UniProtKB/Swiss-Prot annotation:
Keywords: Aminotransferase, Pyridoxal phosphate, Transferase
Similarity comment text for this entry: Belongs to the class-I pyridoxal-phosphate-dependent aminotransferase family. LL-diaminopimelate aminotransferase subfamily.
GO molecular function: L,L-diaminopimelate aminotransferase activity; pyridoxal phosphate binding
Source organism superkingdom: Bacteria
Residues that coordinate or bind pyridoxal 5'-phosphate: Y72, S108, K109, Y132, N187, Y218, S246, F247, S248, R257, N292
Job of this protein: Involved in the synthesis of meso-diaminopimelate (m-DAP or DL-DAP), required for both lysine and peptidoglycan biosynthesis. Catalyzes the direct conversion of tetrahydrodipicolinate to LL-diaminopimelate.
Record-listed substrate binding positions: Y15, G42, K109, Y132, N187, N292, R388
Name of this protein: LL-diaminopimelate aminotransferase
One of the GO biological process terms: lysine biosynthetic process via diaminopimelate, diaminopimelate-aminotransferase pathway
Subunit structure: Homodimer.
């Protein structure tokens, strides 16, 4: 009989969001008339930008002609999209990222997991706590951790707590760590980091020859001018960081699927014989072998994000969701809740009432007012006592949900 990858057996009972779905399903089955409002998973609700729809429609028409048909595309992504990304997302902010250093993909979730394919298994790893679960689970699946402990953490990982005491900004590791996962604006806490603080991480990585895996999936939601949108705004970051970006939240591509990863050409790692190896060729080889590229139609839709009309429409989507976040934060704060995030990110991070755990508060909101959020403990040990609400929903649902919660 075939042997299984036993690393999967080390995973905790269930991925956070399937567990939420299971509880919601049980509740809805016994409360068939309940009007459930879901503010849990960060999935968008508003239609795609018209510029993207028109671009994809034209691309489909192109595919119906002999001259316009496209088969397999380049694994790295079409040059015309990578050029737009380079110009608008990086060069415009003073980051010297070339189109050649950009790899178009079908999701930053995939890339932040798949990047482990080109990194050795003996690297030491640090994650924030709480943390986006994918960073931890992907390391467990590939055998980079020990067993799960009773408190839900894994042997072999370094956890960097983020909480009220440190303004949800992690402290630098006390010892040398090879791989550092950072996500800003942060999921789940909604916290942001300024250039001075981010420079400390870049300096640490350069000093220790560490690699930063920087998730900037929510950079488009930044409102404050002094907050960096890219780690490459920090001098030296091209020598120590890989950045993940996505069209999912800013342009509503969660169901369309398009993202990109930046791997600078001069970024290097070490072989077992201490030979310096460039990471770009390794990732290019990995993608060429395991990935067929994002469809021509989808990439044309992504290109339209950078058109004049596309930019206006994307800005409209971002403003809509951030107004939702503002409404949520104001309503909850005015009713006595301690609330964080929501100013430069589409997530609200709530301190749950005393005597309740995160899952207690989840069940409380579900049973009392049919509102679904995400228990903070699902993001890590330090997330216990907190609760995440997403601003990705209709305006009427957001207002209704807040009225239900504050009137319990």
């Amino acid at each position: 009989m075939v042997q299984v990858n036993e690393n999967y057996l080390k995973l905790k009972a269930g991925y956070l969001f399937p567990e939420i779905a299971k509880r919601v399903k049980l509740y809805s089955q016994s409360n068939k008339n309940a009007e459930i409002i879901k503010l849990g998973i960060g999935d968008v609700t508003e239609p795609l930008p018209r510029a993207c729809i028109e671009a994809m429609g034209k691309a489909l028409d192109d595919m119906g002609t002999t001259d316009g048909f496209r088969g397999y595309g380049p694994e790295q992504g079409y040059a015309w999209l990578r050029e737009k990304i380079s110009e608008h997302d990086f060069i415009s902010r003073g980051c010297q990222i070339s189109p050649e250093e950009i790899f178009v993909s079908d999701g930053s979730k995939c890339d932040s997991s798949n990047i482990l394919d080109i990194l050795g298994k003996d690297n030491s790893i640090a994650v924030t706590d709480p943390v986006y679960p994918v960073y931890v689970d992907s390391n467990v699946m590939t055998g980079r951790t020990g067993d799960a402990l009773e408190n839900g953490t894994y042997q072999g990982l370094t956890y960097l707590a983020i909480n009220e005491a440190n303004n949800f900004l992690p402290e630098l590791p006390e010892k040398k760590v090879d791989i550092l996962y950072l996500c800003f604006p942060n999921n789940p806490t909604g916290a942001t980091i300024n250039k001075e603080e981010l420079k400390k991480w870049v300096d640490y990585a350069l000093q220790n020859k560490s690699l930063i895996l920087f998730d900037a999936a929510y950079e488009a939601f930044i409102q404050d001018n002094d907050i960096p949108h890219s780690i490459y705004e920090i001098e030296g970051a091209k020598d120590c960081a890989i950045e993940f970006r996505s069209f999912s939240k800013n342009a509503g591509f969660t169901g369309v699927r398009c993202a990109f990863t930046v791997i600078p050409k001069n970024l290097k790692g070490l072989s077992s014989t201490n030979e310096e190896i460039e990471l770009w060729p390794l990732w290019n080889r990995r993608q060429s072998t395991k990935f067929n590229g994002v469809s021509y139609v989808v990439q044309k839709g992504a290109e339209a994000v950078y058109s004049l009309e596309g930019k206006k429409q994307v800005r409209g989507l971002i403003d809509f969701y951030m107004e939702n976040a503002k409404i949520m934060k104001n309503k909850l704060q005015n009713s006595g809740y301690k609330v964080y995030g929501g100013d430069n990110a589409p997530y609200i991070w709530i301190k749950v009432p005393d005597q309740m755990t995160s899952w207690d508060f989840f069940d409380f909101l579900l049973q009392k007012v049919s509102v679904v959020g995400t228990p903070g403990s699902g993001f890590g040990l330090a997330g216990e006592g907190y609760f995440r609400l997403s601003a990705f929903n209709s305006r009427s649902n957001v207002i209704d949900a807040m009225e239900r919660i504050i009137n319990i």
